[in-house]
From Swiss-Prot:
Annotated S-S bridges: none
Family statement drawn from the similarity comment of this UniProt entry: Belongs to the p23/wos2 family.
Name this protein carries in UniProt: Putative protein PTGES3L
Database matches in PROSITE patterns: CS
Positions of transmembrane segments: none
Lineage, opening ranks: Eukaryota, Metazoa, Chordata, Craniata, Vertebrata
Organism for this UniProt entry: Mus musculus (Mouse)
Gene (UniProt): Ptges3l
GO molecular function, one term: Hsp90 protein binding
Span of domain CS: 3-91
Length: 131
């Protein structure tokens, strides 16, 4: 069976870019965050292999980036190399794959956003027990 991309949502913050790979009941999860790309793979609840490789719009700090798995998705928070520089898109190339969408539920203006961003990162870090 041929692998397919996972539906992916993303949003931008002053220090981080957040990505959510929307896969329920995932198994065999692998997330590799490098300075210029992320490689994600897993199997969904039906055993279908999912694979995404994303070349980032800009360089990231892979050593200060994390991922968190839940029953419904795998979320990555990727530390930007240059903070407070807006990313107009997630990908290096100016293309929009059908599986990639902006997460408008979490997208907001940056003004006064540092505390919100810190709270999100701390929430994921605290909830690390089920990784």
């Amino acid at each position: 069976m041929e692998r397919q991309p996972a539906r992916t949502l993303w949003y931008d913050r002053p220090k981080y870019v957040f990505m959510e790979f929307c896969v329920e009941d995932s198994t065999d999860v692998s997330v590799l965050i490098e300075d210029h790309r992320v490689v994600f793979s897993c199997r969904n609840g039906d055993g279908v292999e999912l694979y995404n490789e994303i070349e980032f719009y800009a360089k990231v700090n892979s050593k200060d980036s994390q991922d968190k798995r839940s029953g419904r998705s795998i979320t990555c928070f990727v530390r930007k190399w240059k903070e407070k520089v807006a990313w107009p898109r997630l990908t290096k190339e100016d293309i929009k794959p059908v599986w990639l969408s902006v997460d408008f539920d979490n997208w907001r203006d940056w003004e006064g956003d540092d505390e919100v961003e810190l709270a999100q990162v701390e929430h994921y870090a605290e909830d690390d027990s089920d990784s």
